[in-house]
């Protein structure tokens, strides 16, 4: 072996021993005739000292520059008093180098590895192989490896089998666009890359593999955000003969064990909250419970006011009128209120009403707002009491369709929590349960809230009679306002699956064409089953404190779904296209 130790493994217990290191020169310094090299590898850094007594080695060290690849042999020794570096794992020792081999030279990198904050992300992604040398990036990928190892260990110990499912499959409606792969041998036909292993893992349950897991690559051709990539990794889990409480208990234990092993954090039992309560109190089905702010419904106090902005929604069962109190916010300048008004407009809100509570004892005179003249004082007092308003607070209001108000004030709640540093703790895991089966569209049609294979909490007859109010056996694990994982008990009876398809507008012929294999499987003794899938990239992002999942993926795509390093996607030559029976249409020029 070319090395005896990694740099990050060196400590005082090795004092006096000979070691051989391999890595990159992170920094070179010349102090008073002595050369110091900081050597970096994936596990950390170590300081190597070369003195002029060994002329040949000293001369070699003098020629070395940053990012040269080197092999160094030397003796471990404790650093002198006052020279200990507490910021380095090996900071209590140094290596007295007496042999240095340059394994490869390096050109000057396109950006310094010590000063990266002002380097654009595109440059970092173009030279990702250099960007990943930075200790901050290496730390994230090492922690990602520890996370997957911990999860595999837990699932292996609990009787789960790691089974791979196909990457080349067929398109099924799962909510996003598919990535399509043309078939050379079947002219005009296409494979689809899987958005998830959903149907295959259900078929594994039918086949009798009652505890399955896979760390699976998934693909979705959708618009990208901070927590989205066209290809992403999923911790996919499915079980038979367990109900939702047992699946939730098992996967909660896995996450609690993971945080203890990797971050030395202990979580208590995760609280449970229904979807209805989460939307009512927080305006989100993935609430951040670190934030103490809550939405409070006040429609009952505004039904009869002479102010249509409030009275209209207050009397419409499809709308809501909601208040959000910000403690100590009465001193907020108008410019900041205007900024928040613009912010909620992103979510469809047509304005942001507010009341500043300056001195409640003075009644209406102690309130500052353009809307107080439209609301009777008795109603104002009920509203202020209900939200817990005291002097110095500001209360914001939303009045519109239920979805608009929930999303707008829910997002404002998160924004205020961060802007005013209101978060009460570092971690807040929870479960959200009792999701609706369907979302009703403007035209009265239905969309599956999770996916079409989620089991409802009712019979097929009850489901078809009252689809708008049906609840599902779905559950989401949420951490700090981020959905870590989502799952459900699946439909295991053919009649129920067909009923759900019908409600989604998928008639018998289309059912057979797209899902015939699943319906066949449900006829042959499908067991009760359910599961859950975690987004590995999001989980690592949270555990490392990264701002984007691009920071925790070795070679991510940009927000335009491109790889600037390999220049993918790229053009394909005409011969390859002919073999795939594809002819490109000329782009119409826009004048």
From Swiss-Prot:
Aspartyl-tRNA synthetase with relaxed tRNA specificity since it is able to aspartylate not only its cognate tRNA(Asp) but also tRNA(Asn). Reaction proceeds in two steps: L-aspartate is first activated by ATP to form Asp-AMP and then transferred to the acceptor end of tRNA(Asp/Asn). It comes from the Bacteria. Transmembrane segments: none annotated. It is an enzyme of class 6 (ligase). Its EC number is 6.1.1.23. The lineage of its organism: Bacteria, Pseudomonadati, Pseudomonadota, Gammaproteobacteria, Pseudomonadales. L-aspartate binds at residues 174, 220, 450, 490. Residues 198-201 are annotated as: Aspartate. GO terms for cellular component: cytoplasm. NCBIfam families: aspS_bact (TIGR00459), PRK00476.1 (NF001750). Keywords: Aminoacyl-tRNA synthetase, ATP-binding, Cytoplasm, Ligase, Nucleotide-binding, Protein biosynthesis. This is Aspartate--tRNA(Asp/Asn) ligase. Its main location: cytoplasm. It is found in: Cytoplasm. GO terms for biological process: aspartyl-tRNA aminoacylation. The record marks 31, 82 as: Important for tRNA non-discrimination. Coiled coil: none annotated. PROSITE patterns: AA_TRNA_LIGASE_II. Pfam families: GAD (PF02938), tRNA-synt_2 (PF00152), tRNA_anti-codon (PF01336). Belongs to the class-II aminoacyl-tRNA synthetase family. Type 1 subfamily. One of its GO terms (molecular function) is aspartate-tRNA(Asn) ligase activity.
